[in-house]
């Protein structure tokens, strides 16, 4: 396990959900690091030289650059001591299977529900989009009941990397679905486990500290009608 004196730089965009995953991991584990905000609408040359694809998140540890949000969180939890261990003892493969089960499908279902791709539509989505999102919410509830033994978190009574992988997207979809479709994400889970999970996550200091201002975020979404508008114009958590 690494000690706190290693040179860690985190390259992020404060509104990117993938980078948000790593921000949560760093906060939960209280890992000291330097944070560099990257303007994705105008990527600096030095960053492209460092990270050829120019994407976030990325970290540089002792001169070595690593990318991909899930892989970064696995790496950070394995390598760094911290305030928390985010992989349950003896259940790493089970946790990875849980993450794999929702990583693509929940993200895709949510994007289609709020507008198809990364854009927004106003008004009700079609029956296919509703059914698909409902299936994903029911899947999350089954994970909580089976893998989490009732929760409140996905893997049980303690937060894990699985929760940090799902939360940035759930948080954005909850706000977008309420604003643009008049639908409450938490009500799409029939047993109430999804709602309790949302409440448990919202109570965590890391989540509270990294949450953007809803009113500012909604204003930016209404202006651009895109979840990923920050890829095209300068924005950050303080001025979305």
Model-derived features: positions:
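Substrate-binding/catalytic groove segments of enzymes
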Residues: 151, 174-180, 207-210
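Short alpha-helical "patches" and their helix-cap loops
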Residues: 89-90, 124-131, 178-196
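A contiguous, mid-protein "functional segment" used to position or interact
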Residues: 188-219
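GST-like domain detector, emphasizing the conserved glutathione-binding G-site
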Residues: 1-154, 228-229, 233-240
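Alpha-helical scaffold segments in carbohydrate-active enzymes
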Residues: 21, 97, 101, 139, ...
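Short amphipathic alpha-helical segments embedded in low-complexity Lys/Glu-rich regions
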Residues: 43, 183, 215-219
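GST superfamily/GST-like fold recognition
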Residues: 156-181, 187-193
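Long, positively charged, glycine-interspersed low-complexity recognition regions
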Residues: 207, 214-240
